[in-house]
């Protein structure tokens, strides 16, 4: 019995040491990749990306539609699965197409991560430093040279930034987009944008179309059909992952103003709480904190009355 316990203990120690060695190897390779990228980026011109202020003001002034690209959309372009969306050939093709689009009132947004990263907090800084080191040249190959891109962080400007002093000002600007507008929120079934906070209190009216939290692109045609039943005077806000990028473009082509607003509600919740980490929000699906586990139903009458369609 004693010998068995000793063997188990030795085996556990060996597994621990092996895992540590693997971690050290991965960390060393990552550091080398980042060092190599410091030289690589000296020889390639980064994309031109407008600031958060410039992007928000452009949307307000021009009533522009918006598609936002990030690491998830990039991976899907290259047929890699992400947490809540399986790779799909058509999805990849459409994401590539829209990335290169040249429409006057359709803003294609990129993460502003291809130059100095010192403005970002430690976790996002480390993440983007490694991501760009691995994929910089692939990003540059996918983009259109000379095109003016806008800023994907228009709805993610609390958690990623080291200096959070401008967040209040940015949220004020953001809310001007839907001030006194009839809005349609197309969101995941447990995202519940604006519930429990005042994010959309200045909107004239709110309607909701609920879609599956994961793999929404499988239901794309049904989502598009439901969206097109709305009057074109309404502002359509999208929070359905990478599917929003394509939906925003297709709705724009049909004469709607459609904005991929992404994680804005969760960022706002973290801002209101002055959160230091990516915390769960009660009764809301947070992909990056808990991934929707233990998100219950709610019986808020106002919220339920706003739901006009449910896509399954």
Briefly describe each language-model feature range:
Residues 246-312:
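C-terminal functional extensions of proteins
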Residues 4-8:
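Ser/Thr/Pro-rich, intrinsically disordered low-complexity segments
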Residues 182, 234-235:
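Structural motif
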């Amino acid at each position: 019995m004693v010998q068995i316990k000793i063997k188990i203990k030795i085996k556990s120690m060996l597994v621990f040491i092996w895992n540590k060695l693997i971690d050290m190897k991965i960390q060393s390779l990552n550091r080398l990749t980042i060092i190599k990228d410091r030289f690589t980026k000296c020889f390639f011109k980064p994309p031109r990306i407008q600031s958060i202020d410039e992007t928000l003001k452009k949307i307000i002034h021009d009533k522009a539609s918006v598609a936002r690209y990030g690491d998830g959309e990039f991976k899907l372009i290259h047929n890699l699965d992400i947490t809540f969306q399986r790779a799909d050939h058509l999805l990849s093709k459409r994401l590539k197409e829209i990335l290169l689009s040249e429409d006057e009132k359709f803003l294609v947004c990129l993460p502003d991560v291809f130059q100095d990263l010192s403005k970002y907090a430690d976790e996002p800084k480390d993440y983007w430093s490694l991501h760009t080191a691995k994929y910089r040249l692939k990003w540059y190959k996918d983009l259109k040279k000379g095109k003016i891109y806008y800023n994907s962080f228009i709805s993610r400007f609390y958690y990623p930034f080291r200096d959070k002093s401008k967040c209040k000002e940015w949220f004020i600007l953001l809310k001007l987009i839907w001030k006194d507008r009839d809005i349609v929120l197309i969101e995941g079934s447990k995202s519940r944008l604006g519930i429990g906070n005042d994010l959309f209190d200045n909107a004239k009216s709110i309607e909701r179309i609920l879609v599956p939290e994961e793999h929404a692109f499988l239901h794309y045609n049904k989502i598009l059909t439901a969206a097109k039943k709305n009057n074109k005077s309404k502002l359509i806000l999208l929070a359905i992952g990478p599917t929003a990028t394509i939906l925003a473009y297709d709705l724009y082509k049909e004469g709607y103003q459609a904005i991929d607003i992404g994680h804005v509600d969760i960022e706002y919740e973290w801002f209101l709480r002055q959160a230091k980490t990516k915390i769960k929000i009660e009764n809301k699906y947070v992909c990056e904190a808990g991934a929707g586990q233990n998100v219950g139903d709610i019986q808020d009458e106002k919220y339920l009355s706003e739901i006009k369609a449910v896509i399954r």
